Design a protein with these regions (language model features):
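Divalent metal-dependent phosphate-bond-processing catalytic cores, especially two-metal-ion Mg2+/Mn2+ enzymes
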Residues: 3-276
Length: 276
């Protein structure tokens, strides 16, 4: 699982699955519009691993290699947000109802009450469901860090999304959700994402590992910080120079030209979020 985590985004082009599919990209065609990026990362990771000098699995038997490869495929495919609901449902089904109550017993570690990965009676499917959940949760982990760290990740992700939006506009494609730098309200989107995805995901993790309760505390604190900004109507600070130029342009043609030029130049200045 550690190798899968290290390589789960290898070679990422900075463009989402939605873009790949809408653009009928080579990646989308290769992987039949199904978890395009995740399949691409897997292929690139295993091509890298099998090279001379980097083959960390070369001493394994063929049978053991197949087992590890199967596990890694499942884990990296689990980082596709399209399977988020399925992953949470799988984990929820393994947690006894009484553990979901706030007044449950304060054991130091409840993991063994759900499933013991060393128990021979635990099926391989159950074990893999846990590993998939762990890597999926870790992939969303920036929102469980303190606000300063989380904020930096939001800046980086927003920059990446908005560059994609610029490209979509230049290609006359539908602009993907959160990828329009002119209309995206970042505070509101963060409130929705943390409340709808992060906290429910990490609630299960904290049930299994109570010592990780700080992750939920950080997520709730981040949600409150973003909610405060949203309540204040703050979208300021998310206006790079290109957006300012577009706001001052009254011509649709001029706007399209600015978008296209910005993409072609691959302007990668990271958006700074000013919240003082």
């Amino acid at each position: 699982m550690i190798i899968a985590a290290l390589g789960h985004d290898i070679g990422h082009p900075g463009l989402t699955n939605t873009f790949q599919i809408n653009a009928s990209s080579e990646m989308a065609i290769t992987y039949n519009d199904s978890s395009c990026l995740e399949n691409f990362h897997l292929a690139k990771l295993f091509k890298t691993i099998r090279k001379e000098g980097t083959n960390i699995f070369e001493k394994l038997s063929s049978q053991d290699y197949k087992k590890i490869r199967k596990k890694m495929i499942s884990e990296i495919l689990a980082t596709d947000m399209a399977v988020h609901g399925k992953i949470l449902n799988n984990i929820r089904s393994k947690i006894p109802d009484y553990l979901l109550q706030e007044d449950n017993s304060n054991t130091s570690n409840k993991f063994e009450l759900i499933t013991d990965i060393n128990n021979e009676e635990t099926t391989n499917e159950e074990k893999q469901a846990l590993f998939d959940y762990f890597i999926h949760s870790a992939d969303l982990g920036h929102n469980t860090k303190n606000f300063d760290i989380s904020l930096r990740w939001v800046e980086l992700l927003s920059t990446e999304f908005w560059l994609q939006g610029d490209k979509e506009k230049a290609m006359n494609l539908t602009v993907s959700f959160l990828c329009d730098r002119d209309t995206t309200n970042v505070p509101k989107s963060q409130v929705g994402f943390i409340g709808g995805f992060i906290i429910p995901t990490y609630n299960f993790l904290v049930i299994m590992f109570p010592t990780l309760s700080y992750t939920i505390e950080n997520a709730k604190n981040n949600l409150n910080r973003w909610q405060k900004l949203a309540d204040e109507g703050r979208k300021k600070g998310w206006t790079p120079e290109k957006k300012k130029a577009i706001k001052n342009s009254s011509s649709k043609e001029k706007k399209n030209k600015i978008h296209k030029e910005a993409f072609l130049k691959r302007k990668t200045n990271i958006v700074e979020i000013k919240i003082d």
